[in-house]
């Protein structure tokens, strides 16, 4: 619903702003003189690291397993609508961010939720909801799903069965990077994100090429079962609900997590990064998730395998050559590491808002996160999915409420920005964003 409202309120900015989004990411409107710590591409890479995670592989497989192939179409629709929602929350995050005395930046829903509720005379409720959001964000930062699914795929191809050791290795690596601060995080993510996405896309294309004769029938099946009354898990409603649930987890639109990464961008024009953020749901849900679903359906493993999650995607990869799931294992580990890094940063920002920005407070969170990551692989998949959904829902409630309350302000800002920047003919670099 939030995506529909934002798409209509911003006059389909997810379509008309697509070209401008690419120009912002390219750096056409960036300047080192502006406040912030990261370039538009680096901020986007950190956010993409959090969104294009194993939800795009294992989460899609769960959706296809429980909602049928038809859930794919609803995931894509949710991704399209989520582009407008992501645009709104990222713009607000940059607009209401805080620049500390040392030049570092923090932002997110915990800053604009109190602002929104304060506008309607409910400052105390705003403060409470911001705290509620932060508690849920800290819970979500453990990213149990990522570690669990990465271990599942590594175990699938290597028979490595030490769950605690795997979690401990992830925790140690994440701890080393997190202790380096946001600059070390973006240094890793702006390299990992493009590489891991490209590797996965190429691997999926190989699977599709081997099964090329089944691509058109698979697309027809996805469309047909999205509306078929006999579809899995309650027909149309089951496919729709599962598609939207997994899409929300995959692209995080409306949850309020990615805006924390975007808040670090170097800009004095908040809306420019809102346009850059349009690309996240497009890349994650419309491209990556569609490829995952197609790989599963064209290979037929959704009908022949009893596996769920990433194990089902692995079965699809195995239809090419027996060793091909090893490629998926590499991708799974990269996706998991990048997502855990991004969410570790989100959790730390929420922790500092709740408690303190002191170094002691930061160290306490990092130790908490690493200790939880070390046992993350031991959780069963059904419990993991429920935990993820619960944290996402609790984060989305105050975030979307704030977006609704600040909608008139966003509409006015968009109209002004569109006239000043988007419609202004300037082939050379501009310093307005």
Tell what function each PLM region has.
Residues 1, 75-76, 126-134, 156-180, ...:
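Transmembrane alpha-helical segments of multi-pass small-molecule transport proteins
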Residues 1-22, 137, 149-154, 161-211, ...:
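Membrane-interface loop-to-helix entry segments
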Residues 1-54, 64-71, 82, 404-433:
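N-terminal alpha-helical transmembrane segments of multi-pass membrane transport
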Residues 24-44, 79, 90, 94-140, ...:
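Transmembrane-helix boundary/entry motifs in multi-pass membrane transporters
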Residues 9-14, 56-60, 141-153, 174-187, ...:
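Transmembrane helix-loop junctions in multi-pass membrane proteins
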Residues 1-20, 65-104, 284-289, 324, ...:
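Extracellular loop-to-transmembrane helix junctions
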Residues 89-101, 204-221, 234, 263-267, ...:
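Extracellular/periplasmic helix-exit of transmembrane alpha-helices
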Residues 33-66, 92-95, 101-116, 132-135, ...:
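Alpha-helical membrane segments and immediately flanking helix-loop junctions
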């Amino acid at each position: 619903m939030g995506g529909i409202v934002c798409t209509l309120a911003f006059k389909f900015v997810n379509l008309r702003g697509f070209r401008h989004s690419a120009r912002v990411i390219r750096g056409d409107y960036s300047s080192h003189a502006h406040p912030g710590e990261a370039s538009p591409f680096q901020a986007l890479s950190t956010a993409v690291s959090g969104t294009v995670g194993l939800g795009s592989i294992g989460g899609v497989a769960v959706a296809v397993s429980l909602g049928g192939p038809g859930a794919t179409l609803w995931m894509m629709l949710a991704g399209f609508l989520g582009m407008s929602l992501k645009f709104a929350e990222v713009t607000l995050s940059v607009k209401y961010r805080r620049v500390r005395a040392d030049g570092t930046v923090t932002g997110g829903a915990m800053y604009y939720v109190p602002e929104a509720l304060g506008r309607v005379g409910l400052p105390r409720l705003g403060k409470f909801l911001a705290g509620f959001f932060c508690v849920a964000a800290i819970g979500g930062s453990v990213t149990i799903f990522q570690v669990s699914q990465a271990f599942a795929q590594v175990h699938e191809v290597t028979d490595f069965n030490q769950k605690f050791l795997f979690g401990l290795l992830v925790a140690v690596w994440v701890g080393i990077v997190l202790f380096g601060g946001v600059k070390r995080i973006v240094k890793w993510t702006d390299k990992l994100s493009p590489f891991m996405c490209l590797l996965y896309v190429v691997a999926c294309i190989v699977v599709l090429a081997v099964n090329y004769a089944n691509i058109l029938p698979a697309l027809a099946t996805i469309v047909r079962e999205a509306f078929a009354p006999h579809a899995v898990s309650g027909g149309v409603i089951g496919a729709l609900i599962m598609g939207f649930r997994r899409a929300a987890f995959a692209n995080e639109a409306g949850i309020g997590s990615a805006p924390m990464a975007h808040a670090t961008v170097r800009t004095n024009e908040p809306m420019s990064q809102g346009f850059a953020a349009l690309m996240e749901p497009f890349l994650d849900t419309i491209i990556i998730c569609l490829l995952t679903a197609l790989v599963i359906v064209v290979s037929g493993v959704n009908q022949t395998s009893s596996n769920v999650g990433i194990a089902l995607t692995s079965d699809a990869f195995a239809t090419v050559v027996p060793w091909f799931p090893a490629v998926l294992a590499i991708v799974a580990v990269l996706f998991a590491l990048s997502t855990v890094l991004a969410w570790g940063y989100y959790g730390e920002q929420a922790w500092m808002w709740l408690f303190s920005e002191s170094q002691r407070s930061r160290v306490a969170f990092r130790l908490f996160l690493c200790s939880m990551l070390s046992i993350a692989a031991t959780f069963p998949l059904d419990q993991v999915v429920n935990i993820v959904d619960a944290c996402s829902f609790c984060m989305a409630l105050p975030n979307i409420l704030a977006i609704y309350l600040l909608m008139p302000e966003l509409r006015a800002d968009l109209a002004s920005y569109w006239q000043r920047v988007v419609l202004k003919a300037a082939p050379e670099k501009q310093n307005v964003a």
